[in-house]
């Protein structure tokens, strides 16, 4: 069929169908890029809301003359302009939906609703050393109070020894109003969240296993499961904290991640006898879960850091004291990390996920993390019960905790909990030197 007739037919299609039909073949790709088609769709879709009067003959003549300049642009110019404008409108709509926050944690309160409305999903691109790419949309996810846990599992994974990197992206439908389901096949744009190096995965810290899989943690927040039988990929799990979740998932590009703008609070100098920073105290919210099942949700108020508590560039917050039984907190339920694939599922008893949000005196998140951690045997002096510990540390902050196992109640209790925050982060946050 002549190209002129095909272009005429394509002009009657909506924008979504046009984008999809451009993926059929090279010929349709070029035909679906026709500038005249897209400039008309652009004018119809993004016409100024103030221009509601009927066009006069003079305006119609001016419009027809402006269409003549369409041919001065390269093929696909107006298609790119249309999609860029559409992405901007979707970003604006999603940003407006995130304004309500929880009073307790200052994190978005309508995460589930925003996910449902936007159709936002997450995609990983596995790259082999040869350059070959494997693109996978998420299989399922769990929306937690302060984080999102995203799962990928498949029967046809590439061999783990051939992989060099894993890139995590937010994937948002370009035409949000037509496609609201996260698993719907539709045109999406990608926002890079994090890059992970998988070239030495087996040398990474193994944080748990059961009879089917071994799990390895790749910071920040990525868990990779390998089959015990053949060492192949079983599943991938990513833990993404809710603070800045949507911004990082929709505002970046496919090559550059979005960086949250710095939020500095300037305070007066305090003498050494008073608190190091702030006069109202920090607040910590901590959740411990197994990707779906919660074991602990707790908030600590009025936390202060003093100059005497600085060691190795970190300030220490003492949350729970081993010697004070009244401060000890139980983990409710059977502790462990749940995992699943297309054919099997299980639970790794030595692995849990910790979500932490440290707020300053104005309830702004100063440090936040969502990461799997490993429960390891520990020895606590003057503590008769079996003891375990877990820890997490990055350049900004960290956590160290000791747990006791009480056989009479079949429960873990957190008997010591310390939080660390870098002095450099505090100085940057409060504008101090």
From Swiss-Prot:
Q: Does the keyword Calcium apply?
A: no
Q: GO CC terms for this protein?
A: SCF ubiquitin ligase complex
Q: Which domain of life is it from?
A: Eukaryota
Q: Where is the F-box domain?
A: 1-41
This protein's record includes keyword Endoplasmic reticulum: no
Tissue and organ expression note: Expressed in testis.
Give UniProt keywords alphabetically.
Answer: Ubl conjugation pathway
Pfam families, per the entry: F-box-like
Tell me the SUPFAM superfamilies matching this sequence: F-box domain
Assembly information from the UniProt record: Directly interacts with SKP1 and CUL1.
Function according to Swiss-Prot or TrEMBL: Substrate-recognition component of the SCF (SKP1-CUL1-F-box protein)-type E3 ubiquitin ligase complex.
What is the protein name for this chain?
A: F-box only protein 15
Q: Could you tell me which species this protein originates from?
A: Mus musculus (Mouse)
- Please state the gene responsible for encoding this protein: Fbxo15
């Amino acid at each position: 069929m002549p190209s002129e007739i095909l272009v005429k037919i394509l002009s009657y299609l909506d924008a979504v169908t046009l984008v999809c039909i451009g993926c059929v073949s090279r010929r349709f790709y070029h035909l679906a890029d026709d500038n005249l088609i897209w400039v008309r769709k652009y004018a119809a879709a993004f016409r100024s809301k103030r221009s509601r009067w009927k066009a006069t003959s003079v305006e119609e003549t001016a419009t027809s003359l402006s269409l003549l300049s369409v041919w001065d642009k390269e093929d696909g110019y107006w298609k790119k302009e249309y999609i860029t404008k559409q992405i901007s409108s979707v970003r604006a709509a999603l940003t407006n939906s995130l304004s309500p926050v929880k009073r307790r944690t200052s994190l978005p309160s309508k995460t589930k609703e925003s996910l449902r409305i936007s159709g936002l999903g997450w995609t990983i691109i596995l790259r082999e050393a040869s350059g070959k790419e494997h693109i996978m949309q998420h299989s399922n996810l769990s929306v937690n109070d302060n984080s999102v846990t995203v799962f990928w599992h498949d029967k046809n994974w590439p061999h783990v020894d051939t992989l060099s990197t894993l890139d995590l992206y937010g994937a948002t439908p370009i035409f949000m109003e037509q496609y609201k389901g996260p698993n719907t096949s539709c045109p999406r744009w990608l926002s890079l969240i994090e890059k992970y190096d998988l070239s030495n995965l087996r040398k990474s810290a193994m944080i748990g296993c059961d009879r089917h899989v071994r799990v390895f943690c790749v910071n920040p927040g990525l868990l990779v499961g390998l089959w015990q039988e053949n060492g192949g990929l079983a599943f991938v799990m990513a833990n993404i904290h809710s603070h800045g979740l949507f911004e990082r998932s929709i505002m970046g590009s496919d090559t550059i991640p979005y960086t949250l703008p710095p939020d500095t609070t300037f305070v007066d100098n305090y003498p050494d006898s008073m608190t190091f920073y702030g006069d109202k105290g920090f607040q910590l919210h901590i959740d411990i879960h197994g990707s779906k099942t919660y074991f602990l949700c707790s908030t600590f108020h009025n936390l202060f850091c003093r100059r005497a508590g600085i060691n190795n560039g970190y300030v220490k917050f003492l949350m729970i004291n081993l010697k004070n039984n009244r401060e000890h907190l139980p983990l409710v339920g059977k502790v462990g990390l749940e995992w699943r694939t297309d054919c099997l599922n299980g639970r790794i008893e030595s692995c849990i996920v910790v979500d932490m949000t440290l707020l300053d005196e104005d309830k702004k998140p100063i440090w936040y993390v969502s990461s799997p951690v490993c429960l390891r045997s520990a020895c606590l002096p003057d503590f008769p019960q079996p003891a375990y510990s877990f820890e997490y540390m990055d350049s900004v902050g960290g956590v160290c905790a000791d747990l006791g196992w009480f056989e009479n109640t079949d429960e873990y209790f957190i008997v010591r909990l310390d939080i660390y925050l870098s002095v450099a982060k505090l100085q940057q946050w409060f504008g101090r030197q």
